[in-house]
Amino acid sequence: MKEIVLAGGCFWGVEEYISRIQGIVKTKVGYANGTKENPSYEEVCSGVTRHAEACYIKYDESIISLEELLNKFWSIIDPTVLNKQGNDRGTQYRTGIFYLDEKDLNLIIKSKSQEKKNYRKPIVTEVEPLKCFYEAEEYHQKYLKKNPGGYCHIHLD
């Protein structure tokens, strides 16, 4: 099993989209690569903690490769916009690929380079090692499964 953390705006939609992909073993939403230990949702939304809303993903690479997973991720974000996805604005809504395995870095860089060809503007999606990930409050986990009519900036149909 492999792991990666992806930030693509509001984590509710990212988790729901990713969880529908064959080969995904586990997802959980949380706060990645910020400055405060174990922040609350309110603290993250204030922008002071510098965390990104993100989705931790465990996947079976015999079913889906990291390259395929990243291609799906690129399809649901606008990687040229900083601190905004859909109607959501703030540093917590920035896009990012946070890796746990250093061996994944070359593939991530290659994927980002390929994606650049689709845009005239520069890609601002962060690519960094995962420095920290704090699981979000329980009511955020599987939010759109619990609240099917809930807000989502991603077209899930």
Curated annotation (Swiss-Prot):
Annotated Pfam families: PMSR
Listed EC numbers: 1.8.4.11
Residue numbers annotated as active site: C10
UniProt-listed SUPFAM superfamilies: Peptide methionine sulfoxide reductase
Name of the top EC class for this enzyme: oxidoreductase
One Gene Ontology molecular-function label: L-methionine-(S)-S-oxide reductase activity
Superkingdom, taxonomy of origin: Bacteria
Catalytic activity: L-methionyl-[protein] + [thioredoxin]-disulfide + H2O = L-methionyl-(S)-S-oxide-[protein] + [thioredoxin]-dithiol; [thioredoxin]-disulfide + L-methionine + H2O = L-methionine (S)-S-oxide + [thioredoxin]-dithiol
Record's keyword terms, sorted: Oxidoreductase
GO biological process, one term: protein modification process
GO cellular component terms, semicolon-separated: cytoplasm
Function of the protein: Has an important function as a repair enzyme for proteins that have been inactivated by oxidation. Catalyzes the reversible oxidation-reduction of methionine sulfoxide in proteins to methionine.
PANTHER family found in the cross-reference section: MITOCHONDRIAL PEPTIDE METHIONINE SULFOXIDE REDUCTASE
Entry similarity comment: Belongs to the MsrA Met sulfoxide reductase family.
Name of the protein in its database record: Peptide methionine sulfoxide reductase MsrA
Gene (UniProt): msrA
